[in-house]
């Protein structure tokens, strides 16, 4: 759980390093292992780091290519970054770290926005193209990583949390009544609205190019992925579905076990976290699991039925 932040003044006004730092400091809890800043006149990028892959200073962000044309601030985890790194190295790219953020950076340099079709994982990042003076923004397919933004006049401001955006003096603290209505109706917000007027959630499975422009102050997003539930013309035998689900599930779990720090699993008594634990424990014996519970001394019979601690404890002993 790292954090990103940034300011892009589309009218060419210089970004205040003090303001950028203040924004990034508000989300320091997301990245206790380091901070970094990049400013170049009208563009500023901030980062708070939670080190998981490559714990060395070489993986410090914001990170630039050797030519300094591209600069990235990235929050995420790429599960296929080792394969992509090998592919990019074969194409002539040289890496300065072992991080997945640098792989995302050079993947964009090599393939542009088409790199998103190759990234397997969850992420939210911004890449500044110094030559074209254009900011590239992208978010993972399911919107796992948070990415908020606002456009106030010529000021484009983004961050991993809304409170960082509120630090900017041009952003007003106003309730979005439509967002509030949506939340009270559905107990969730399914559009790009938030509870704060003017602050939007960058859509999942999407990207955007934002060029320096003193005239046009609009962000147009493009969808690069969406769900496809199309049924096959001829259904396969049931056993084939079982075997394919088993293969894909094991692949998904094993891909996420790459880390330079100790891994753990939130374990409930359900079959989802239990199944993940069973697969992960085959590669990482005695993996640590964590289960949360509440004092149920005065709980009703119905409430006691939701307590899964006993089942979770049993599963933790198994693995």
Regions found by a protein language model. Name each.
Residues 1-319:
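Cysteine-centered catalytic environments shared across enzyme families
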């Amino acid at each position: 759980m790292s954090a990103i932040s940034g300011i892009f003044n589309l009218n060419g006004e210089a970004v205040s390093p003090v303001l950028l730092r203040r924004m990034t400091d508000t989300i320091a809890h997301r990245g206790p292992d380091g901070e970094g800043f990049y400013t170049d006149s009208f563009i500023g990028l901030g980062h708070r780091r939670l080190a998981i892959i490559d714990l060395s200073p070489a993986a410090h962000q914001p990170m630039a290519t050797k030519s300094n044309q591209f600069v990235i601030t990235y929050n995420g985890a790429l599960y296929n970054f080792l394969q992509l790194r090998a592919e990019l190295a074969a194409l002539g790219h040289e890496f300065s770290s072992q991080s997945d953020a640098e792989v995302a950076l050079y993947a964009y340099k090599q393939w542009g926005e088409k790199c998103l079709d190759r990234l397997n994982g969850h992420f939210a990042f911004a890449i500044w193209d110094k030559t074209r003076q254009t900011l590239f923004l992208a978010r993972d397919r399911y919107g796992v990583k948070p990415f908020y933004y606002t456009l106030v006049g010529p000021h484009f401001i983004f961050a991993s949390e809304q409170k960082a955006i509120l630090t900017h003096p041009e952003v007003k603290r106003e309730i979005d009544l439509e967002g509030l209505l949506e939340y009270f109706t559905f107990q969730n917000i399914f559009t790009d609205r938030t509870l704060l007027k003017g602050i939007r959630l960058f859509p999942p499975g999407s990207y955007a190019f934002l060029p320096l422009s003193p005239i046009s102050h609009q962000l147009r997003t493009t969808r690069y992925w969406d769900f496809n539930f199309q049924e096959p013309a001829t259904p396969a035998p049931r056993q084939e579905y079982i075997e394919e689900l088993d293969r894909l599930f094991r692949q998904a779990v094993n891909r996420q076990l790459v880390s330079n720090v100790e891994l753990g699993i939130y374990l409930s008594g359900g079959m989802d976290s239990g199944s993940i634990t069973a697969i992960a424990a085959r590669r990482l014996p005695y993996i640590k699991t964590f289960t949360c519970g509440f004092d149920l001394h005065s709980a009703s019979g119905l409430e006691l039925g939701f307590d899964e601690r006993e089942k979770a404890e049993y599963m933790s002993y198994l693995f």
